[in-house]
Amino acid sequence: YTDAEHPMTQKEIQQKLETEYDMVVDRKAVKANLEDFINDGTYNIDYATKIRFSPNPKTGELEKNEILTGVYYNAEFTDSELRLLMDSVLFSKSIPSANKSEILDKLKDLSNKYFKFSAANIQSYESADREMNKELFYTIEILDEAIKNGLQVKFLYNEYGADKKLHHRLNEDGEVREYIINPYYMVATGGKYYLICNYDKYDNIAHYRLDRISNIEILDTPRKAKNQVEGLVGLDIARYMNEHIYMFHGKSVKAKFEAPKYLISDILDYFKADVNFKELENDQVLATVKVNETDMQLWARQYCGQIKMIEPQSLAEACKQDILDALALYED
């Protein structure tokens, strides 16, 4: 019922207890309980005080009394913080609609009656969407436990078919493929959740979408030590995520490309502050960034009519070939 903009006086608390809970209490009881809550320190209760002079019942002399007023609960989250969390849930591409509603209701309960947030559009937002993996939260719990205890996991990985439903990935023999994985980190980017791990057959880093994982189990076998996986020791997660904008695994390269100045904002959106610019003629800039080579190639496709890849030469040739392949699709 309260926040910093909607505090309550002791009298209002008395009235609320009576009208909402059929509890009749006197002012002294309200004051005593408020002081207990405040002195306990467990409850985030803020308040103001005002001075009142009243006669002593025995002596008749005026006495100074400090009155608690303007009492309110200081919530853990501000409304703007709570709205940010709820927006993140609402527009997540991995969380099924039913789970979104449950989470949003729980988050909304962290505020008060004055907090306004409408989630009425969730169903319409998701209604035409593909089938969602309902095992996502269970997968997160299992992976969290496995990472904490340094254990391997096994799971099935899924891909969408033309029916917009998830289907187990198959091996070359047409049988369902089972993955034995060494898990290390869970990360989120672009509204999707990923597992940074190692596929046990190899010694490099791999990524898997959490919403594509099903039938996950923890194994009794310990995961590989990080020093057995190439690039995992001393891994800077923040930098790693900046270099892997689409979460392809593989090596990172120092990429250079020319772009018009009006694309600088878009470039910074993707590559953050890790990109450096050098001004060129004709309102162009030379951008330099360390990035996963496959991610860079995919990003360049979006702007193939505006940017020119310069280095490395192999990446420039790959981008050029992408344009030729795209053109061939439209030739008779």
Task: Set out the residue ranges of the language-model regions.
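General beta-strand recognition
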Residues: 63, 154, 194-196, 286, ...
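Polybasic (Lys/Arg-rich)
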Residues: 234-332
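Short beta-strand micro-motifs enriched in acidic
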Residues: 50-54, 187-189, 280
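Short, basic/aromatic recognition patches that contact phosphate-bearing ligands
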Residues: 1-91, 174, 180, 327-332
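Bulky hydrophobic/aromatic content
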Residues: 70-167
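A generic structural signal for beta-strand entry/edge sites
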Residues: 5, 152, 192, 281-288
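Core beta-strand-centered patch of the WYL/Sm-like small regulatory domain
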Residues: 127-256
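Secondary-structure transition/turn motif
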Residues: 67-76, 198-201, 290-293
